[in-house]
């Protein structure tokens, strides 16, 4: 009987003990292994995830989508590097971009008139925000996730499906499609909505409250499509 018990113990996984449940660490590890395996078999392009941790910003490349605001899982299976807020620059993302945030100032610092087509914004907290607009360039699809009490915690919006050709790869100044995002939508008081205005040629004069166009003037010899998301 003793040899039988010894053999049984030798073949028992270290994540388990007799008559007990698996530890939380083992569950997290098994979940991560499953996600990595899924990403391997689907051969999906890595997604970019940006979130704040303390006074730094974490920029991560992930094999698959990570559950909203699961920082432990993101650090476990994604390849991440820390960036100081002062080092953030205007940039472009050619794939999916997900941002987890807890305050609007950080979100504004990360976006900073970013050039991105497919964006997901997840509010990892219960803060409420006043009306304030952030500018995004080239946005085609927006997804949001909040922890609000409103039933519409997760919403999606298709802004447009028109392509800008090669302009996406020439820098944010060449952007033809500009979206203004009202951060009050994260309060979850209503469903996600938008409206667009075509053929706008003078952004600085038509939208004087946005400093983006004063510090970095947009070319005036072309027509823009402006979308307001609220």
UniProtKB/Swiss-Prot annotation:
Glycans are attached at residues 46, 59, 199, 221. N-glycosylated. Disulfide bonds: none annotated. One of its GO terms (biological process) is mitocytosis. One of its GO terms (molecular function) is identical protein binding. Residues 1-44 form the signal peptide. Belongs to the EPCIP family. Homooligomer. Interacts with PKD1 (via the PKD repeats in the N-terminal extracellular region); the interaction is not dependent on N-glycosylation of either protein. This is Exosomal polycystin-1-interacting protein. The gene is Epcip.
